[in-house]
From Swiss-Prot:
It is found in: Cytoplasm. It comes from Aliivibrio fischeri (strain MJ11) (Vibrio fischeri). S-adenosyl-L-methionine binds at G168, E169, S200, S222, L223, H224, N301. The keyword Lipid biosynthesis does not apply. Keywords: 4Fe-4S, Cytoplasm, Disulfide bond, Iron, Iron-sulfur, Metal-binding, Methyltransferase, rRNA processing, S-adenosyl-L-methionine, Transferase, tRNA processing. Specifically methylates position 2 of adenine 2503 in 23S rRNA and position 2 of adenine 37 in tRNAs. m2A2503 modification seems to play a crucial role in the proofreading step occurring at the peptidyl transferase center and thus would serve to optimize ribosomal fidelity. This is Dual-specificity RNA methyltransferase RlmN. GO terms for molecular function: 4 iron, 4 sulfur cluster binding; metal ion binding; rRNA (adenine(2503)-C2-)-methyltransferase activity; rRNA binding; tRNA (adenine(37)-C2)-methyltransferase activity; tRNA binding.
Amino acid sequence: MTTAKINLLDFDRKGLRAFFSEELGEKAFRADQVMKWMYHFGCDDFDQMNNINKKLREKLKNKCEIRAPYVSEAQHSSDGTIKWAMKVGDQDVETVYIPDGDRATLCVSSQVGCALECKFCSTAQQGFNRNLKVSEIVGQIWRAAREIGLEKETGRRPITNVVMMGMGEPLLNMKNLIPALEIMLDDLGFALSKRRVTVSTSGVVSGLDQMTGKIDVALAISLHAPTDELRSQIMPINDRWDIDAFLASVRRYIASSNANRGRVTVEYVLLDHVNDDMDHARQLAELLKDTPAKINLIPFNPYPGSPYKKPSNSRIDRFMKTLMEYDYTVTIRKTRGDDIDAACGQLVGDVIDRTKRTKVKQQGEAIPVKTV
């Protein structure tokens, strides 16, 4: 029986040094050399690591591998946005590349599917399958950098910002999220500034409290409603941790953080005639008066089967102006990639649907026809 090789992308620097010492009998600086090859040069071939002696390279080839998710499908938008379905094991997750001048943001997934059942989210329709490993989280960045082109080839960083806003709830995968964030920030890893790495949460207070004082990155919170009654209707997690508990944990985190510069980004998806009238805007302004915040309004991205609609431009504009009357900094998220499957999780949902239909065909069974 062949022993599975150890994927070195699963280790942060501390873990990699321990592995080299305890399993390979090597000094810490050797681990550092290999880490630099993996992340600075996008190298997954031990034989190319020309400052590593041959004996160690042979050890590494026998026991280890550097294996990132691979692209199973890609959609390219006319505005430069790329949405990838990345294969993790026998499943897919979504990773989205969003270029904007000198800035290039990568939206990264943390889970296969999601357990939170937010009513407006395409990913929620797929249910929850499993947490991603460290290698599957950082591997999305590694693979995207390879797809876009390494810094040494293009003269510029392929990715300047990472947002943990893809499929899944990051704070329900704390065991793998923390070392993945460490790799993103590490000078031998992706060497990103802590202000250029953002974790978004729908309100997992226990996870946010674990992060407090342990890892310092930018924080974004998915609020989406100004009252517990409405939030519980569209985000069932609110029944576990209500708005007051959530915002209290947010204040604790930003008080311990330098990356957030004293305030949090509040994400608020605008659903037509659900959470987007002027009373909602005023309630939101009052709700956040004790929580220093900038507010990012997100016009809803429709997806097949969704019961919600995007508000009119006039409703979006009125909502924004009402908040600005309370002296909040308010932005409206720019629509990107609207000529491809724009809603988070939609591409993978399509991949899953096609896979199921192919299996049914192969089994010779009838294929159900969707009615409109």
